[in-house]
Amino acid sequence: MSNPFAFRSAQVTFWTTVVYLALLVPLVVINEGVPPVQPDGSLFLDRGLNLTEAWLDLGHITERFHHQNSRENDVVRDYLRLRIEQIIAANDAEARTTVFNDLTSNVTYLAWGSAVPTHYQGNNLYVYIRGKDDDQGEWWHNARAGKLIGKGGVLVNAHFDSVSTAYGATDDGMGTVTVLQMIRYFTKPGNQPQRGIVALLNNAEEPGLLGAAAFGKSPLLPFIHTFLNLEGAGAGSRCVLFRSTDREVTSAFSNVQSPFGSVVGSDGFKMGLVRSGTDYSVWHDIYGQRGLDLAFYRPRALYHTNQDDTKHTSRESLWQMMAASTTTLINLSADTGSDYIGDRPDGDRSKAPNGSPSDGVWFDLFGSTFVLFGLRGMFAWSLTVLIVGPLTLFGMMYLVHKQGKGYAFHTKLRATSDSSSEDGDDEDGEVIRLGGWKGFFRFPFALIVAGALVTGAALLLRKMNPFIIYSSEYAVWAMMISLFYFGFWLIMRGSSYTRPSALHRLYVHIWLFILGWVALVFATVLEDRMRIASGYIFVFWESQVFLATLVAVCELFSLPRKIDFARGAAEEAEVRDHLEAVPHSDAVIAPSLEEATSPQRAGQSSNSPQEDDEDDVPDEETPLFRKAGRGNKLDTSFLRRGYRRSVSAIMDSNNEAEDGPKRKQPFEGEQAWSGPMVTSTWILQFLLLGPFMVILGGQVGLLLTSAVNQTGVDGSSLLAPYLMIAALSAILLMPLSPFIHRVTKHVPLFLLAVAFATLIYSLVAFPFSPRAPYKTFFRQTVDLDTGDTQVHLAGVEQYLRKIIADVPSALGQEIACDASSSRRDLVDCTYDAAQVPPIPTYGSGKKSFDLPPGVSPGPAYYGKLLTVTVVNTTAKIATQGSKTARLKIDAVDTRVVELRFSKEGPPIRSFRVVGADSWDDRFGAFPDDGARVLRLWRRDWESSFVVDITWKVDGGNTRGLEGRAVALWSDANDAVNTMPAFREVVRYAPAWATVSKAAPGLVEGSKAFKV
């Protein structure tokens, strides 16, 4: 019966194909799907969570756009406040909770990510749920800066505002209703946390993490040591552990129902590869808290668009976030040890005294198991593999050499009847070819060829159809994997066919070990110097390659000693030479070993043995020598050696060969000495190399692809995603490389057809669709002095012009497209919007802004929307070399105003809103070179901004300030009347396109001012 694990073509093809399919298919299914509501989820449902209630809440808060600068935002806030009160009352938890309706906090600071000096007036909602170990009463009134309050609390946070162009179901409606459910769960009798929990619903995250900055003024801030931030950067799908500060807090997430995530995402933020941010950045970077970012992350094409609604998410997605949040908060609040208490390693007393964290490494397996361990442990592991691995393999190779079985890296030796010489000093010895180097350089050559194929494909797609990955990422994956597989197989199989080598597997393993060792060196340096843990893939890989290579080296022990093989080879050569030189020598010369082990004895025919025997008997007419010809010359070297064997010895040898076990023959032309070599160990090597690496590489590859495949429209690199998939395809197929030369042609030829089909598709298919729409960024500007208005669409010019071509008000216009000032590698296309002017006050009930039917707004209307009054100026030239002016700014139906100062004038050195708190240094000092933009946010809709600004004045230069005041309008709920240009673009854009905001304000109205 044939060995099912033999190193033969059929078996290798079958097992490698089955294993890859059995792993890759589930990985894709898990990446695309969302876990169902687990039956054991009823434990949470019975104890406090209510999925139906959460889904209804989500529908209520996402009925309309609710940007912070919209009236609907107030409606959502009022609804959330009511729901909090209802939940607390239903659980009879008034005595265990305190609701904070923040209408007083304000912060003046350097806004995160923009370096723009900003004033913001907060209106967050948050609930303190008292823990069993917390102090009684309203202890926060007596809290002092730097004082440890109890054992530290836990923050769970989500923002309830949306962007101006989205309903915010995923960003961040599901996080918001999850916070409501956390309040419901932990206020239910029997669920009181051990340490207190602060449930925060913050406002104005979208314009720049403003709500998190305002929370810095909360009396509860010193109490919070850890946090769970809930976010959404897609539209439904799975929620992923976006990032985490350390191993200890990550352990609180490790036993959730359906864990999903990798430390690779966290390292992407740490290295600055991800340019966007969440409230996590404020909690950790500014306040020093330790925690996690749990977020939805795909599909990004629907992010910040009107398709971020309940239609494009699911109850399963919501349940996954609710269940994961509950488990994580239970674990964080139940930790009463010293993990989150103690002095900080950086000694910063302005931040939470939450102990010394340790870096971690984490990843999930098939979305069901979570692996977590320390980075320092992995560093020690990495060093061990780097040092012990090569030493062990060198030691084993030395033992093989000492055993006389070192065929690898030896091409020949000279053999005599009693000795073998590898140095060739015995000139009388016969040269025995070993073929030791045969096949050594196949792997790097095949890797270069296959790598060139996928790199060329990446460059071709970048040039011909750069956005195809936007909607067809799996076609790109299929093309890259198929191309690399076929290219690599073609070289390896072709080389093996023309020059078979029994050392092929060993040499490929050696190359894999060398490449893995180099990669591990870089990964280890990153672990030690930058605390980057993403190299865990290479740590596992090199460990697996080391073991597989060790097996390959051990296989050499099954070979005969080189000296024995050389003697046998020399004897067979001598016998063969003598048979050709001496007449009828087969009657007196022993047969070769091959002849002895065959069913037909030398000189005996299977058809007529008696007749053959008679023909072989010499008589007086038999010539002494055969006729001259090839092989009939007497081998004088053979005679010189004087080698003779008796007839009895010949017969004994024949009998032994016939009665004993058959000698294993080399595989299809491989080296003659390789017959006894153990080869069935290949399946062990493949299992060491393949499955775990495919799981790790596949999961990371799919996660990264989902994260970056739709970022090109934002101005990110168009080539990087293709090169990433090309590299990951090579990594995924590396476990197959030692065995691919035994794969039959059927799989590679099928994959060649797949590669050809997907390449053609990727080159000619239109890259966008209603399910993966192209995203353009809208902004309308109005000169409030003249009434001139323009629409600016940011994006890729090729597609912008197609979109604008269908916009009625832009027909017949010459469209100007220039490099975007705010988005890298994109353009701003501009057209006149006089036919669709904005009317921000439409429906506001303000009679002074009513327009007669059919009358378009002009300078008289726009001039009343924003006023800037210089209250006074004060010169301090003699003492400080500066001037100060007080400005009063009024804007209609907006909460936000910007002051943009001319570049020709002096920059602003400081500013302060009258009645507000002073500058908050936690976010950074006021820019040393001054500022030319100030941004002001108010809590209500009517109050005036009164601002003191200071600028430097040179000795003889007393020039004043010039600039433009800009009012931002963001409420698109009645866009057909208030923002008809925006409504027009949304309505007439092709089905394959969608519209998002380009800035916090959809409409920017500016007016000149001078001080």
From Swiss-Prot:
Biased composition (Polar residues): 595-609
Gene Ontology terms for molecular function: metal ion binding; metalloexopeptidase activity
GO BP, one annotated term: proteolysis
Listed Acidic residues bias regions: 610-622
Glycosylation sites: N50, N106, N331, N709, N872
Cofactor note (record): Binds 2 Zn(2+) ions per subunit.
Annotated binding of Zn(2+) 1, by residue: H159, D171, E231
Disulfide bonds: none
Protein residues bound to Zn(2+) 2: D171, E206, H304
Cellular compartments per GO CC: vacuolar membrane
InterPro entries to which the protein is assigned, alphabetical: Fxna-like_M28_dom, M28_fam, Peptidase_M28, PFF1_C, PFF1_TM
Keyword set, alphabetical order: Glycoprotein, Hydrolase, Membrane, Metal-binding, Metalloprotease, Protease, Transmembrane, Transmembrane helix, Vacuole, Zinc
Active site, renumbered: E205
Membrane spanning residue stretches: 10-30, 379-399, 440-460, 472-492, 506-526, 537-557, 683-703, 720-740, 748-768
Presence of the UniProt keyword Protease in the record: yes
Region (Disordered): 595-627, 650-671
Function statement: May be involved in vacuolar sorting and osmoregulation.
Name of the protein in its database record: Vacuolar membrane protease
